[in-house]
C-alpha cells in the first residue's frame, strides 16, 4: 500500500525512499564533513515545510546558508538555535549556555510550536549532539532532553527528526556506549562512512523499503 506524500518526507538527492512522518533518525559518523553533508540533505525543509535546527558548532547565519545550499529558499523557512556566533537575525536564537539543557529544551519546544503555527510539517535537526554531550556532567541529561523535547515533538507533530553525532569527538565518556544507548530511542540509525573525496556509504537500519547500504555523493 502506497503512502501519500503528505505522510512522508522527501530525501532530496539522497538515494532513499521518502521517509514516513514521525521518524527519528540517529545519524552517526567519524568524518565531520561527510556527516554534515548528509545531515543537511535530510534536514533542509522543502516548500511546504518548516525547519528548526539546533547548531552547536556553527553560527546561525552559517547554518542557514548550509540549508539553502541544499534546498534553495530553505533558509527563509528555517529557525536556528545557535551556540556559536551572535543572534542578529529574526531566524536565529542564541544559546547562551549549552550545558543548560532545561533552557535548551524549553526554547526548542517553543520554537517548534511557533514553526508549526506557520506550517504543520517540519524537520528538526540537532548538529552536533556529541558537542552537547561534551558540555554536560551527566550524559543521561542529554537522553532526557531528547526524549522530553526532541522525540516527543516528533511523536505529537507532523515531523522528521535528525540527531547527528560525531563519533570521533572526545566527549569524556565511552562513545560506543552513548550511541548504543541512543539507538534504543530512535526509529532509524544511519552511519556515514566517507569512502572517497566526494563519496560516502550509508549503513542503514530501521528504514523500511531502503537498502541496508547505499552510496551517496557529498
Task: Show which residues each predicted segment covers.
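Phosphate-binding/switch loop-helix module in NTP-utilizing enzymes
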Residues: 86-151
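Phosphate-binding/switch region of NTP-binding enzymes
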Residues: 164-218
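Loop/turn-to-beta-strand initiation segments
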Residues: 50, 120-123, 155-165
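Conserved beta-strand segments of the P-loop GTPase G domain that flank and frequently precede/overlap
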Residues: 25-30, 53-56, 81-83, 125-127, ...
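Short acidic, S/G/P-rich loop/turn micro-motifs used as interaction or catalytic elements
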Residues: 31-34, 59-60, 130-139, 168-172
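Nucleotide-state-sensitive switch-loop elements of NTP-binding domains
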Residues: 58, 67-96
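Glycine-rich P-loop/Walker A and Walker A-like loops and their local beta1-loop-alpha1 context
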Residues: 2-68
